[in-house]
Amino acid sequence: MINSNNQVLSEIRFDWNKKEILEILNMPLIDLMWESQIVHRKFNSYNIQLASLFSVKTGGCEENCSYCSQSIYSASEIKSHPQFQVEEVLARAKIAKNEGADRFCMGWAWREIRDGKSFNAMLEMVSGVRDLGMEACVTAGMLTEEQASRLADAGLTAYNHNLDTSPEHYKNIITTRTYQDRLDTIKRVRNAGINVCCGGIIGLGETNGDRASLLEVLSNMNPHPESVPINSLVAIEGTGLEDNQEIDSIEMIRMIATARILMPKSKIRLSAGREKLSKEAQILCFQCGANSIFYGDELLTTSNPSFQSDRKLLKEVGVSFNKDFETCEKTLSSL
């Protein structure tokens, strides 16, 4: 909550309302940054989790998400790829581990998981990643209770299923899946004992109120999502949002800081669109509460800062991270 002096009281809550969140989101930036740092220092160390993201199956998704080049409704020219073999994925995971990745995230461009050979291969991949001593995360659309249970049995650490935007703005972004579908998927994941990875995207044409509404839904989940990816739109030619303007970096800093205040213990992951942020803006995001990044030259179908530039940045900032990332020279992009 906010006291009479406009200070945020650092406590873990699950009953934030939109009015309170807007007050935080709209605080003078210097005050917002100060308050978020207080919360971040109380609940977390300045340790950055390094996550590697690999597209196991690219393109051909049946959903019509207007920001996504992997949708069958998109006119984007992307290089589609059928599902990689288990051995190929685990070889990538092993390289990621040697590079210092703490978590290996695997993405499938699917509307939903379907039982059969592909799902069985996914289970093998999850088990294989865990056998390497890494956290395993999957993002593959909707799933059933039984599928969630089987993923849990395979050792899945986290399942990513983003809300994208507010309930009010959602219908302007996607119509092939409802907001409730997303919430139901998250519930099944949680009921199976798998950590929830859930966040959103800014720059979709939403208002500040929409951003507060998205954060309200996330911060009222009990427990809070284990990790919260905050993405900024990467406008891709051929998608429905190709003409959207880039967001100002201050908007990302505000979103990161507010998310940290609302969800003190969650990993706040600075995700897609990070390449557009200056070094200084990224440093402010880390200062305000971001404590996880995706590293590697590409995130599914969008670009990302280079391995070398990230390593240099983290060393300059003075945060702690896996030391293998500091010494390894080989990168996934070199394969």
UniProtKB/Swiss-Prot annotation:
It is an enzyme of class 2 (transferase). It comes from the Bacteria. This is Biotin synthase. The lineage of its organism: Bacteria, Bacillati, Cyanobacteriota, Cyanophyceae, Synechococcales. [2Fe-2S] cluster binds at C105, C137, C197, R269. PROSITE patterns: RADICAL_SAM (PS51918). The gene is bioB. Catalyzes the conversion of dethiobiotin (DTB) to biotin by the insertion of a sulfur atom into dethiobiotin via a radical-based mechanism. The keyword Iron-sulfur applies. It holds the Pfam family BATS. SMART domains: BATS (SM00876), Elp3 (SM00729). Homodimer. Its EC number is 2.8.1.6. Pathway: Cofactor biosynthesis; biotin biosynthesis; biotin from 7,8-diaminononanoate: step 2/2.
